[in-house]
From Swiss-Prot:
SUPFAM superfamilies: Sigma3 and sigma4 domains of RNA polymerase sigma factors (SSF88659). It comes from the Bacteria. This is UPF0251 protein DSY3441. It comes from Desulfitobacterium hafniense (strain Y51). Transmembrane segments: none annotated. Pfam families: DUF134 (PF02001). Belongs to the UPF0251 family.
């Protein structure tokens, strides 16, 4: 019997889920797909400055799982930037945090409603 799915906890969805060259036709060969949980590891580790261990606790998974997700996310990000491909963020094995869970002292739900993932108040540049 297979092991049950362990969902990765994600604080908030990206404000934009598509990035890339403005003049490119986004066919399948010109597109890189990144999952929402891969995006979350990039956000937590590279933007927020968390260690892989801290990221793992926030996402409710093992550090080795975060390491694998992070490696794949960086490969996809590099492929998009270096080869001029559109980066599409969608899907993945995640559940959106309600801000009430164990270890969620950041108030994800309230923060998401007020600021979004960028950490900026709405209308702030």
């Amino acid at each position: 019997m297979p092991r049950p799915m362990k969902w990765r906890k994600v604080c908030c969805l990206p404000e934009s889920n598509r990035f890339g060259p403005l003049d490119l036709n986004a066919g399948d060969q010109n597109q890189v797909k990144m999952t929402v949980d891969e995006y979350e590891t990039i956000r937590l580790i590279d933007l927020e400055g968390f260690t892989q261990e801290e990221c793992a606790k926030k996402m409710n998974v093992a550090r080795t799982t975060v390491q694998g997700i992070y490696i794949e996310a960086r490969k996809k990000l590099a492929e998009s930037l270096v080869n001029g491909k559109v980066l599409q963020i969608e899907g993945g094995e995640y559940r959106l945090c309600d801000g009430l869970g164990n270890g969620c002292g950041q108030g994800c739900y309230k923060r998401r409603r007020r600021m979004g993932c960028s950490g900026k108040e709405e209308g702030e540049d």
